[in-house]
Amino acid sequence: MSSIGVVFRVTTFGESHGPAVGVVIDGVPAGIQLNEDYIRRELNRRRFCHIPVLNPRCEDEDFQILSGIKDGLTTGTPIAIVVWNKRAVSNYYMDIWMKPRPGHADLAWYLKFGKLYDFRGGGRASGRETVARIAAGAVAKAILKQTIDVDVSSHLIELGGVSISRDDYTFNDVAKSWEKPLPMIDDEAIEKAIKVLINAATEGDSVGGIGEVLTTEVPPGLGEPVFDKLKADLAKAVMSIPSTTGIEFGLGFKLARMRGSEANDQIVLRNGKPRLETNRVGGMLGGMSIGEPIRFRVAFKPTPSIRRPQRTVDLEKITETTITFTGRYDISTAPKAILAAEAMTAIILVDHAIRAGLIPRIIRK
């Protein structure tokens, strides 16, 4: 449905070309410092208006906090935030109504709901929905930082086939990458990736990418041993983001090609506590956190809407046809989508930390 979480529960609403998208966040502890400037900074991270092919719609991300915050502090009641859609242009979509775009969710929505869905801009299946997740993620990140001192960040390791050349980066390197034109730690890769984006746009095409989410050290004990594993909940949350095609934790699929003697993280003492020497597993064992940073990578497919002729079916005439999308579209969803993955990570961590008793109901200072 449209909600995720057990105690810290996030519900998003709204369509791409409706009046607004928004989120209701329940289970927020009282006493968390939170203000509009901070939320605005988080929302602005997804704009990329300085690279027009990444965001031709370029919404201002004007938002309104309706409830749950007073005098810069959370009140413990549900927080409701709406982000207004001011630059949607729907006429492009009238020509392709009942002609599902290859690679998009149009066909799946039609087969499930018939004509009872808002197809404009992809409706709920649009990347625009993720702005609500990022607003909720901003709240979640503030909670994590102010209670258990955990930070979450993300970056792109590949965009349009252009990969970063470094693997010796730190969490701070990743966090600072958002000060660059693209969230990549490698300046040379950024320059090449921008050229790839522009070339793809010129050719009426699109590109995919791979991103990575990292945290600082997460307290041990988040997650349950079997069906409520932290790893499983993270995977579910991230795979719900539009355009996501895969996820791998730590070294992921590389571990499948190793022997156990290579793959196993040796356990050592550090400051009197058992720790992993290498963290190849990405910060979790048995699906639970173990005091290490959490790390995973996510693959995003190319944007389905492209300006090249594609074969489809006219669902009213029941005939094969071709369509060429003439509207605005992001050449790649990856830069915005990895930010949504960062937000979903924070949301899941807060939910599990509250359930584990690490975050109290009321923060008294």
Swiss-Prot record:
<comment type="function">
    <text>This reaction introduces a second double bond into the aromatic ring system.</text>
</comment>
<feature type="binding site">
    <location>
        <begin position="124"/>
        <end position="126"/>
    </location>
    <ligand>
        <name>FMN</name>
    </ligand>
</feature>
<dbReference type="GO" id="GO:0004107">
    <property type="term" value="F:chorismate synthase activity"/>
</dbReference>
<dbReference type="GO" id="GO:0005829">
    <property type="term" value="C:cytosol"/>
</dbReference>
<keyword id="KW-0028">Amino-acid biosynthesis</keyword>
<dbReference type="InterPro" id="IPR020541">
    <property type="entry name" value="Chorismate_synthase_CS"/>
</dbReference>
<keyword id="KW-0521">NADP</keyword>
<keyword id="KW-0456">Lyase</keyword>
<keyword id="KW-0274">FAD</keyword>
<feature type="binding site">
    <location>
        <position position="286"/>
    </location>
    <ligand>
        <name>FMN</name>
    </ligand>
</feature>
<dbReference type="InterPro" id="IPR035904">
    <property type="entry name" value="Chorismate_synth_AroC_sf"/>
</dbReference>
<feature type="binding site">
    <location>
        <begin position="301"/>
        <end position="305"/>
    </location>
    <ligand>
        <name>FMN</name>
    </ligand>
</feature>
<keyword id="KW-0285">Flavoprotein</keyword>
<feature type="binding site">
    <location>
        <position position="328"/>
    </location>
    <ligand>
        <name>FMN</name>
    </ligand>
</feature>
<feature type="binding site">
    <location>
        <position position="46"/>
    </location>
    <ligand>
        <name>NADP(+)</name>
    </ligand>
</feature>
<dbReference type="GO" id="GO:0009423">
    <property type="term" value="P:chorismate biosynthetic process"/>
</dbReference>
<dbReference type="GO" id="GO:0009073">
    <property type="term" value="P:aromatic amino acid family biosynthetic process"/>
</dbReference>
<keyword id="KW-0288">FMN</keyword>
<keyword id="KW-0057">Aromatic amino acid biosynthesis</keyword>
<dbReference type="Pfam" id="PF01264">
    <property type="entry name" value="Chorismate_synt"/>
</dbReference>
<comment type="similarity">
    <text>Belongs to the chorismate synthase family.</text>
</comment>
<comment type="pathway">
    <text>Metabolic intermediate biosynthesis; chorismate biosynthesis; chorismate from D-erythrose 4-phosphate and phosphoenolpyruvate: step 7/7.</text>
</comment>
<dbReference type="GO" id="GO:0010181">
    <property type="term" value="F:FMN binding"/>
</dbReference>
<protein>
    <recommendedName>
        <fullName>Chorismate synthase</fullName>
        <ecNumber>4.2.3.5</ecNumber>
    </recommendedName>
</protein>
<dbReference type="GO" id="GO:0008652">
    <property type="term" value="P:amino acid biosynthetic process"/>
</dbReference>
<dbReference type="InterPro" id="IPR000453">
    <property type="entry name" value="Chorismate_synth"/>
</dbReference>
